């Protein structure tokens, strides 16, 4: 009986490892595909002080307002990335102006870069961890908590209190992902890593 139990336990562990590897591979494939279809927006505060965090949100609003007014309509993701790359001076100027208007003299930088992001949920959309292209705005020492959203497709909150993202942005995201990929990113939780051990042990 003990040998039988150990055999089943080893089989269950091997099954779990195989399932984990398959799920990890599927998540990596999803992340790679998703990364090619979005442009994220990342604002890093000077520090975690209340004043610096408040300033971060004001800079965020200024940059989003600037881009909403200037970004041509109907661009695809690659054209949006290129537009952002060629307009970083204007984006930085908008951020700098907001910083000065609020009585600070922090330096600020703006660049389109590739950065690593951990798993993040924004509204009802979850992005798996990995490298993504992002418009990155750094205020001062950029050591404070960051704020992020997705510029393309537009998933930046319309209602920050209730975490409502624009339906148009979600529809664009749905168009470029498979049905299963879209289901995964809108499932409202972390990506599942399924192990068969509990089920197998429960059947003993």
For each of these PLM feature ranges, what is it?
Residues 2-19:
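Hydrophobic membrane-insertion alpha-helices, especially the h-region
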Residues 185-204:
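Low-complexity, Gly/Ser/Thr/Pro-rich intrinsically disordered linker/tail segments
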Residues 50-52, 119, 146, 158:
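Intrinsically disordered, low-complexity acidic/polar segments
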């Amino acid at each position: 009986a003990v040998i039988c139990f150990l055999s089943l336990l080893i089989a269950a562990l091997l099954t779990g490892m195989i399932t984990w590897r398959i799920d990890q591979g599927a998540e990596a494939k999803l992340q790679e595909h998703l990364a090619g279809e979005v442009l994220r927006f990342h604002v890093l505060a000077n520090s975690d002080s209340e004043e610096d965090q408040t300033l971060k949100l004001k800079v965020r609003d200024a940059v989003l307002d600037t881009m909403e007014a200037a970004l041509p309509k109907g661009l695809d993701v690659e054209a949006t990335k290129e537009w952002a790359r060629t307009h970083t001076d204007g984006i930085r100027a908008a951020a700098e102006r907001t910083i000065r208007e609020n009585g600070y003299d922090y330096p600020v930088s703006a660049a389109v870069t590739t950065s690593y992001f951990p798993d993040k949920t924004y509204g009802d959309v979850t992005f798996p961890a990995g490298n993504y292209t992002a418009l990155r705005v750094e205020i001062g020492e950029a050591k404070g908590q960051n704020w992020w959203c997705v510029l393309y497709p537009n998933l930046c909150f319309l209602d920050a209190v209730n975490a409502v993202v624009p339906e148009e942005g979600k529809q664009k995201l749905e168009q470029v992902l498979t049905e299963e990929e879209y289901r995964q990113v809108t499932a409202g939780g972390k990506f599942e890593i399924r192990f068969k051990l509990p089920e197998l042990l429960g059947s003993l």
